[in-house]
Amino acid sequence: MKKMIDYSVYLVLDPELCGGLDGMLRVTEAAMAGGAGVVQLRAPQWKKRQWLDAARALQPLCRQGGAVFVVNDQVDVALAVGADGVHVGQQDLPVAVVRELMGPQALIGLSVNHAGQLAAVPSEADYLGLGPVFATSTKKDAAPVLGLAQLAGLAAATSLPTVGIGGIAPANAGAVFAAGVDGVAVVSAICTAADPAAVTRELYALKGHTA
C-alpha cells in the first residue's frame, strides 16, 4: 500500500475551519474528487470521543474514495478505527513506539523543522512533513518558518517522501513543489474554500497532474 501513495495534495482537516464533522466529511469527499491522496484528521482541541466519532466516519469514506486516512498523534484512535497511519510531531510518541503499536504496514509520518531533526529521523518513518514553509494561523504551536530555500535543502537531504506544510495555497504551491517536495499539505485553503474540489484540483495540477 505504501508504495502506491500519492502525496501530491495532502488534506489536513481542521474541524473549526471545516465546520465540524459534517463539514469535514463534505470537504473530504470533495477534495478526494479533486485528487487528494492523503487525508489527515487533526483536532488538538477535541476530546477523545470526538476524535473517535470523526475517525469512524472518515476512515470508510477515505477508503471508498481511494485516499489514505491518517490520524494525527492519536495512536489509540487510529488503531480503533483501522486507520492507514499516524502522523506525529517531535514532542509526540517516538516513531519507533508508534511503529511497534501500529504494525509494519501502517503509514507513519513525522514533522521536521530543521536539519538537526532531519538527521535524527528514525528508520521507522515513512514520510516527512517539512514546515512550516510559510507563516500559518492553523497551528498555534508552530515551529519557526522555513521559507523555500530551507525547505529545498531539507527535501534534498532525505530519500523519504516529503510534504511541505504551513501557509500553502494555490498562489504559492507551485514554488513549494519547485523546492523538491513530493506533496503539499493544505488546511485552510481547502477547508474554507467554497469549492474544495476545484481548489484541490488546482493544487494537483500545479505538480503536473490532472484529476
From Swiss-Prot:
Enzyme Commission code: 2.5.1.3
GO biological process: thiamine biosynthetic process; thiamine diphosphate biosynthetic process
A single GO molecular function term of this UniProt record: magnesium ion binding
InterPro entries linked: Aldolase_TIM (IPR013785), ThiamineP_synth_sf (IPR036206), ThiamineP_synth_TenI (IPR022998), TMP_synthase (IPR034291)
Reaction catalysis annotation: 2-[(2R,5Z)-2-carboxy-4-methylthiazol-5(2H)-ylidene]ethyl phosphate + 4-amino-2-methyl-5-(diphosphooxymethyl)pyrimidine + 2 H(+) = thiamine phosphate + CO2 + diphosphate; 2-(2-carboxy-4-methylthiazol-5-yl)ethyl phosphate + 4-amino-2-methyl-5-(diphosphooxymethyl)pyrimidine + 2 H(+) = thiamine phosphate + CO2 + diphosphate; 4-methyl-5-(2-phosphooxyethyl)-thiazole + 4-amino-2-methyl-5-(diphosphooxymethyl)pyrimidine + H(+) = thiamine phosphate + diphosphate
Positions bound to 2-[(2R,5Z)-2-carboxy-4-methylthiazol-5(2H)-ylidene]ethyl phosphate: T136, S137, T138, G167, V187, S188
Residues bound to Mg(2+): D73, D92
Cofactor field: Mg(2+)
Top-rank taxon, per record: Bacteria
Binding site for 4-amino-2-methyl-5-(diphosphooxymethyl)pyrimidine: Q40, L41, R42, N72, S111, K139
Top EC class of this enzyme: transferase
GO CC annotations on file: cytoplasm
Known pathway: Cofactor biosynthesis; thiamine diphosphate biosynthesis; thiamine phosphate from 4-amino-2-methyl-5-diphosphomethylpyrimidine and 4-methyl-5-(2-phosphoethyl)-thiazole: step 1/1
Pfam families: TMP-TENI
Protein family membership: Belongs to the thiamine-phosphate synthase family.
Protein task: Condenses 4-methyl-5-(beta-hydroxyethyl)thiazole monophosphate (THZ-P) and 2-methyl-4-amino-5-hydroxymethyl pyrimidine pyrophosphate (HMP-PP) to form thiamine monophosphate (TMP).
Protein name: Thiamine-phosphate synthase
Designated gene of the protein: thiE
